[in-house]
From Swiss-Prot:
Possesses chaperone activity. Belongs to the small heat shock protein (HSP20) family. This is 17.6 kDa class I heat shock protein 1. Forms oligomeric structures. Binds to AKR2A. Keywords: Cytoplasm, Stress response. Induction: By heat and osmotic shock and salt stress. It is found in: Cytoplasm. It holds the Pfam family HSP20. Its main location: cytoplasm. GO terms for cellular component: cytoplasm. InterPro entries: A-crystallin/Hsp20_dom, HSP20-like_chaperone, Small_HSP.
Length: 155
């Protein structure tokens, strides 16, 4: 049996078996149901990475297909970073016939509580190739080297 799907469709059931874990033609009871595609869930669940460097907190959000005009970056209550956006449905023309609609429309919103050591007034955001980058600079702290003073023990 081949692990590569046949170009001739599912009519070729040579050596396929429902008990074979590698069979590609196992009956799927959910096959005909319409579930949201991964692209539509990508909007609703906007994936965000948050890393902390010595100088800043950096957030990167994957927002494929979104324009910067469709995205908002806000600071709420001087401590919460809010990234939100909304993609609108394309205008449908009367003479058009749609065969499949998989790209989603809708909105998303993500919130992150920021630590106290950040400069809220210097937050910067940029968007390139569907990736939003938000940089929140940290307050510079004067870290002094630990000074050790030897104490004489009397007695």
């Amino acid at each position: 049996m081949s692990l590569i799907p046949s170009f001739f469709g599912n009519n070729r059931r040579i050596n396929n078996n429902i008990f074979d874990p590698f069979s590609l033609d196992v009956w799927d009871p959910f096959k005909e149901l319409q579930f949201p595609s991964s692209s539509s869930s990508a909007i609703a669940n906007a994936r965000v990475d948050w890393k902390e460097t010595a100088e800043a907190h950096v957030f990167k959000a994957d927002l494929p297909g979104m324009k910067k005009e469709e995205v908002k970056v806000e600071i709420e209550d001087d401590s919460v970073l809010k990234i939100s956006g909304e993609r609108h449905v394309e205008k449908e023309e009367k003479q058009d016939t749609w065969h499949r609609v998989e790209r989603s429309s809708g909105g998303f919103s993500r919130k992150f509580r920021l630590p106290e050591n950040v400069k809220m007034d210097q937050v910067k955001a940029s968007m390139e190739n569907g990736v939003l980058t938000v940089t929140v600079p940290k307050v510079e702290t004067n870290k002094k080297k630990a000074q050790v003073k030897s104490i004489d023990i009397s007695g």
